[in-house]
Amino acid sequence: MNSSTLRRLLPVAILLAGLAIFLLLGLERYFSFEMLARHKATLTAWVAAHRLLAGLTFVLAYAIMVAFSLPVAVVATPVGGFLFGTWIGACLSVAAATLGSIAVFLAARYAFRDLFRARASAMLARLEEGFRHNDFSYLLFLRLIPIFPFWLINIVPALLGMQLKRYALATLLGIVPASIVYAGVGAGLGAVLKRGEQPDLGIIFEWHILLPLLGLAVLALLPILFARLRRQPSA
């Protein structure tokens, strides 16, 4: 492996090393609702006294969680809602998750796109052609429906040649609905923790939440459907 290849793999290696260190040291225990319940008075007092700094710190910490694909990012948006309220917490979470996703996207594109193209050029060419025509709608759909792993959706568009600004905008718009839901859950977290209970993060799969998300996802796919209909030869 030459120095050029090593240099290209370095960003991804750093992200993977960070994830490995996090898991090996068992640091996930510090990012739990139990830990939040233990320190909520200190946290809320600090946020109230340093609102701007607290917001920036939250965004930075959350973005790092997403960039390193840490398995604790799911608690970050509810914590944002708890500390900052539903709407500010959702806005900060969207900004942070978008920034972290961009970091993964850039690392994957820098490290793997040429290698992926060399190993699977014919397949990639077909996928890339279809994805390029409808990349924004495809990615928006994937972001709206919380089915696929977040880290996987961060990587695939990079390998398929999606433009960064289109990726960033589709990511930002696509994660807004779920972020509002989870931040809303977090806004009521104080009472839940006081009762010694855990918040229900599965709420997003309840029908009164999931159906509107499915509706938005269908709307995101409409441009793809219309494009295919236009390409079909008329009888």
Give residue spans per PLM region.
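Hydrophobic residues within alpha-helical transmembrane segments
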Residues: 60, 64, 91, 95-99, ...
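Hydrophobic alpha-helical membrane-interfacial segments at the cytosolic entry of transmembrane helices
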Residues: 10-19, 170, 214-217
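Transmembrane alpha-helical core residues of multi-pass small-molecule transporters
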Residues: 81, 96-100, 145, 158, ...
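Membrane-interfacial helix-loop-helix
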Residues: 2, 6, 15, 21-59, ...
